[in-house]
From Swiss-Prot:
The lineage of its organism: Bacteria, Pseudomonadati, Pseudomonadota, Alphaproteobacteria, Hyphomicrobiales. It comes from the Bacteria. Binds 1 Mg(2+) ion per subunit. The magnesium ion binds only when substrate is bound. Binds 1 Mn(2+) ion per subunit. Pathway: Isoprenoid biosynthesis; dimethylallyl diphosphate biosynthesis; dimethylallyl diphosphate from isopentenyl diphosphate: step 1/1. It is found in: Cytoplasm. Pfam families: NUDIX. The gene is idi. This is Isopentenyl-diphosphate Delta-isomerase. One of its GO terms (molecular function) is metal ion binding. The keyword Glycoprotein does not apply. Mg(2+) binds at residues 73, 93. Coiled coil: none annotated. Its cofactor is Mg(2+); Mn(2+).
Length: 209
């Protein structure tokens, strides 16, 4: 895809195994069989009825197309705090506003490969958020379908493998379920447990050496 002349490519923050930032790279270039470790986030959005927004990834996504997953995922840009990245991405992808953003799994990371070899490899802190409206108008290039469901039904269905979801969502559900049946009461984790790359403002000029 050719970007407009005034639009910069979306970047991701590359990391080492210690969670430190080592550089940046265009998002469009990093997903392959040897995807480098990079910083991301996952967010689980709940409405006023405490229902979870579950989304189906668009069919032309590079990674796990057409698969059910959590509400939203994304990558912070260099110098962008995670909460601001979540607000931005939720609005871009779902056309809703994420409020009351809370860190719940600060140390989550995963590596998973599709049958074609394309791999995800992320330091991916997990957040919960609230949305005051149930009306969603997603970007169809990102999300092909969506539904609000009860959290207990969702995690029980995922754990029983009655509902097949993305590999990161599957692993996250196993860690979120013990936090309690009421997502609004999940304990908030300390930000100091985040990867260092997520706690440090990264110079936007940082390049891969």
């Amino acid at each position: 895809m050719t970007l407009p002349a005034n639009q910069s490519p979306e970047m991701v923050i590359l990391c080492n195994e210690l969670g430190e930032a080592t550089g940046t790279a265009p998002k469009s270039e990093i997903h392959h069989s040897d995807t480098p470790l990079h910083l991301a986030f996952s967010v689980y959005i709940f409405n006023g009825d405490n229902k979870l927004l579950v989304t189906r990834r668009a069919s032309d996504k590079i990674t796990w197309p057409g698969v059910l997953s959590n509400s939203c995922c994304g990558h912070p840009q260099p110098g962008e705090p995670l909460t601001e990245a979540i607000e931005r991405r939720v609005h871009e992808e779902l056309r809703i506003r994420a409020d009351d953003i809370r860190l719940v799994l600060p140390e989550f990371s995963y590596r998973a490969s599709m049958t074609n070899g394309i791999t995800e490899n992320e330091l991916c802190p997990v957040f919960a958020a609230h949305c005051k409206t149930s009306g969603v108008n997603p970007d169809l290039n990102e999300v092909s379908a969506w539904e609000w469901v009860h959290w207990q039904w969702f995690f029980e269905s995922v754990q029983a493998e009655r509902l097949l979801v993305s590999p990161w969502c599957r692993a996250q559900v196993d860690l979120l379920a013990p936090l309690g049946a009421n997502p609004s009461q999940w304990p908030v984790a300390e930000e100091r447990r985040l990867p260092k790359a997520a706690r440090t403002k990264i110079d936007v000029q940082l390049k891969v050496s």
